[in-house]
Each structure stands twice: as C-alpha cells, then as structure tokens.
Amino acid sequence: MRFLLLALILFAAGCGSSESTEPVATTEVQMAKSYRFDPKTIEIEAGDTVTWTNADNFTHTVQVDGQEDHKVERGESVSIAFDTPGTYHYVCTLHSHDMHGTVIVG
C-alpha cells in the first residue's frame, strides 16, 4: 500500500513541466503519545507534501477529508502530496475524539 502511494506520488511529480521554480517541501506531523497530532494545524504551499509519523505505541490512521484511510503502525509513516490550494481536515479514524487537524494549502 505504501509502495503504491509512493509510486503514485512519484508518477504525478514526473507528469508536470520539466521546469521547476521551487523545490517541494515536506512537513512532518508526529502522531504523539496522548492520542494527538503535533502540530494540529499546518500551512503549506500547493505541491508540498505532509508526512505523518507514528511515534506512539498504538496503531493510528490518517484520513484526509473522508478519502482513503491510511493505517500507520508504530514507527511507520505515510506521506500525502497536496497539489490544490484549500483547507483540508485530517483525522485518525481509530481515535477521532482528539486526533484531528487541518492542512491549509496556499
């Protein structure tokens, strides 16, 4: 599953123009102990990637705006590229009581 996501991201990155004006940035979000995301709100630019890393002892998930639910085991990560400006909400569907946040893409 992670390989497929990575392959899709790499394929999409290769489909654009060969000219690049700025490098793509990656922002990391920790799935910290106490069932929370750190930071909860992220501001990025279109084309940037967010990587969620599970630093907790429990399995968590990342679901952005009701799309595919990505299972993230202890010590693993999942990365999602955000190409379209807007506000996106993400949640751990296993522990949604306080494990939610926002990605703002400018």
Q: Predicted regions span which residues?
A:
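Extracytoplasmic copper-binding redox domains, predominantly the cupredoxin/blue-copper superfamily
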Residues: 8-11, 15-106
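Sec-dependent signal peptide recognition
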Residues: 1-6
